[in-house]
Amino acid sequence: MTDFLDTDYTQRFIFDDSDTRGELVSLERSYAEVLAKHPYPEPVAQLLGELMAAASLLVGTLKFDGLLILQARSEGPIPLLMIECSSEREIRGLARYHAEQIPADATLGDLMPNGVLALTVDPIAGQRYQGIVDLDGETLSDCFTNYFVMSQQVGTRFKLCADGRRARGLLLQQLPADRLKDEEERAASWQHITALGNTLTADELLSLDNETVLHRLYHEEQVRLFDVQKLRFHCSCSRERSGNALVSLGLEDAQALVAEQGGQVEIDCQFCNQRYLFDAADIAQLFAGAGVETPSDTRH
């Protein structure tokens, strides 16, 4: 059984009599960490949770060491949703929004009109890859399904949901022909599995554990469930990185910036709200190549 003391995890499963794999994700602590950093309205928090669930599912399908970045951009009330999830299963996220333009019952199309979804794989070694698809589905689940059908040409279905407390997701994906060689049999099996998956409601996914979800959907199928893979919230910001950003300006511009800001420049992390302060002595130390000691003025 799944140990719900571990509230943030993905869990793979496969169908023994079909060329289909699946994965489930549950996020509570990391989702709460992201929402605690900013006072997001409910519709924004919901979409951000769904995007976190999608990133967690996707990072498990990619064989790489590095960072997966999901960005949804639009011209509407939510200009940006952004999630970063590493191959180490560390996740963070943020949103930009215009609170006065967000009604409680808004749809994805209302909140992110003329939107695009960008999926970027940034490996430690190798070339960066990006795929882009329009946000033209009724839900983020539809948009991710469309992305895989169009760009990867792989049978894929997503079910994503979030309620401000918990984010959950279900991924179903076809595998290369192995158990079923006949194309008609493969198509019929895929249609059967996805039709059953489509009966799962958001309330069920948010409230039931993985074993119960799979029994509810596929009690007549041979399903094998693997061990959970844990996830956690982690922000990769640091004083060193902030200092490097100042170094990239050049000495004169960095000194001028400190002077303009009254003797102390402030760099805030947009993801976690960590604040890093640098004065003239810090700037001198940075450009002397000695690094910056961590003072008492690093704040949340």
Swiss-Prot record:
Claim: Plastid is one of the keywords in the record: no
One Pfam family here: HSP33
GO cellular component, one term: cytoplasm
Keyword Ligase in record: no
Leader sequence residues: none
GO annotation terms (biological process): protein refolding
Domain of life: Bacteria
Disulfide links within the chain: C235-C237, C269-C272
Keywords (A to Z) from UniProt: Chaperone, Cytoplasm, Disulfide bond, Redox-active center, Zinc
Record localization: Cytoplasm
InterPro entries: Heat_shock_Hsp33, Heat_shock_Hsp33_C, Heat_shock_Hsp33_N, Hsp33_helix_hairpin_bin_dom_sf
Record PTM: Under oxidizing conditions two disulfide bonds are formed involving the reactive cysteines. Under reducing conditions zinc is bound to the reactive cysteines and the protein is inactive.
Molecular function terms, GO-annotated: protein folding chaperone; unfolded protein binding
Family membership: Belongs to the HSP33 family.
Role played: Redox regulated molecular chaperone. Protects both thermally unfolding and oxidatively damaged proteins from irreversible aggregation. Plays an important role in the bacterial defense system toward oxidative stress.
HAMAP family for this protein: HslO
PANTHER family per UniProt: 33 KDA CHAPERONIN
Protein name per its UniProtKB record: 33 kDa chaperonin
Recorded name of the encoding gene: hslO
